[in-house]
Amino acid sequence: MKHIRNFSIIAHIDHGKSTLSDRLIQKCGGLSEREMSEQVLDTMDLEKERGITIKAQSVTISYISKKGKKYSLNFIDTPGHVNFAYEVSRSLSACEGALLVIDSVKGVQAQTVANCHSAIKMKLSILPVLNKIDLPNSQPEKVCRDIKKIIGISTKNIALCSAKTGKGITELLEKIIQVIPSPTGDINNSLQALVIDSWFDKYSGVVLLIRIKNGLIKIKDKIKIIGKKNIYIVEQLGIFTPKKIKKKKLYCEEVGWVICGIKNIYSISVGETITTFINSSKKKLSHFKKITPKIYAGLFPLKNNQYNNFKNALNKLQLNDSSLFYEPENSQALGFGFRCGFLGTLHMEIIQSRLEREYNIEIILTSPTVVYEVVLKKNKKKIYFNNPTKFPKNNLIKKIKEPIARCNILTPNKYIGEIIKLCIKKRGIQKNLIYHEKKTILIYEIPLSEVISNFFDKLKSISSGYASLDYYFIGFKTSNLVKIDILINFTKIDALSYICHKNDSQKIAKRIIEKIKKIIPRHQFHVPIQAAIENNIISRVNITQLRKNVLSKCYGGDISRKKKLLQKQKKGKKRMKIIGNIKIPQEVFFTILKIN
């Protein structure tokens, strides 16, 4: 047990976690030179294309120290984007320590602070690692001062390295052994194994990633979930190096994978505790905090006959991503689909891309919304909704509340003025301003609907990419909100409804219908596009008709003949307008995503 180390690698996005993981694997011989590739743990095509880690990945490697002792290192490479903070906290719960990787050029950023505080809350040993020291503009001394002042942790054991060149990797491995404590499990106790991840394999069924806290597990063992009756037989098990290596047993404090013939993806959840059927433990390990989505959107299959395939695909994605929420939804405009909950807009884009790539399902995605709280006049009853179509009539509402996010923005001092203007524009209220040498922390309370609406992109734009953001939900606050309905050819399109602050409603309504006008093709009749609040039209534009020249074959002749042809055309257009179907391109449903 004293020769095992379990740790996560945490950092802000793009600070070099995955490259550092590659170098640790290479140094310890997890893969040969021929098998090595950049970001070897980023297994999804999406991860490689975007250059980000989406799913946490675990690896077991062996290291022989300078003193000649062999150590087993189990580590998890985690995502750095704020949308995937849940993956980080889940990974930390399976470890005794964390490598806090910091870019020695960019320095401490928002997710550096947030991830470090998560590790501190879990009482993990933290080893700060300054990466990219090979770059000419690296500032290790300044970053060390920022670590002490901004994060508030000691830099006594700090490790300096370059994950790209491999400089300092041996010294880092030695510090991992010294700083991160060995686990305290007991191999003689009953089996207790925490399920830290799961995914579906079309040949093997459900695959579980577990961390064994006590006891051991071997092939043909009968196992069960504590608190449930179902019994499973272990068929295969092993570890990742990162290659999938089969073993006959997994021992106390090892991290590995298990296949036990589970075909029903609802049978087991991430965070549950596995034990043996005989000599079983009754004590559950600490359960993960249930994650609640921050935003919701409607997802509808482009082809109605793909509904069942779509449902099965969501089931399988949810097994691998427990933060994904979905429930059936029926739209008058788009038919049957699902209302899905996500951790943020990036998470939403990733799920959409995975559905299209991995399951070949084309989908229409409606604009994202947040959860609202309404207090009704009758009995002062509280209701919650995340779909604009569920917005109650104004005469029934006593008050409406919107979710508020606490935003921690870390920025170089020269961008403070522009960032404050952005926060005010987004209806933010300043709560604190903390100066640190050349950096400042701005703390604002901003409506969550404003945060998900291009706030991050605008923050990056006005700060030339140097400002960083961390945010979390803190509660609901009363606000003056209205629902904008969009009517196309006098028909309300429920999937285009939008909730916003009353002061912004005119401006937003005009922007939406102007964008829709540019996308919908012209028809052989006028197509009005209207925006309404309750039953009051607040803005309107028209798509002008296409006109066929019915007089082209009428050369000369009686003028009354021409009038008859024009009159006939007019009647035909009138009839077409009543019964005609407006073709609404898919891009229309994305317009509200981009109105800001």
From Swiss-Prot:
Any one GO biological process: positive regulation of translation
Topology in the lipid bilayer is annotated as: Peripheral membrane protein
Q: Which GO terms describe its molecular function?
A: GTP binding; GTPase activity; guanosine tetraphosphate binding; ribosome binding; translation elongation factor activity
Catalyzed reactions: GTP + H2O = GDP + phosphate + H(+)
UniProt entry tagged with the keyword GTP-binding: yes
Q: Hey, which family's this protein in?
A: Belongs to the TRAFAC class translation factor GTPase superfamily. Classic translation factor GTPase family. LepA subfamily.
Q: Any idea what job this protein has?
A: Required for accurate and efficient protein synthesis under certain stress conditions. May act as a fidelity factor of the translation reaction, by catalyzing a one-codon backward translocation of tRNAs on improperly translocated ribosomes. Back-translocation proceeds from a post-translocation (POST) complex to a pre-translocation (PRE) complex, thus giving elongation factor G a second chance to translocate the tRNAs correctly. Binds to ribosomes in a GTP-dependent manner.
Q: What's the protein name?
A: Elongation factor 4
The organism named in the record is Buchnera aphidicola subsp. Cinara cedri (strain Cc)
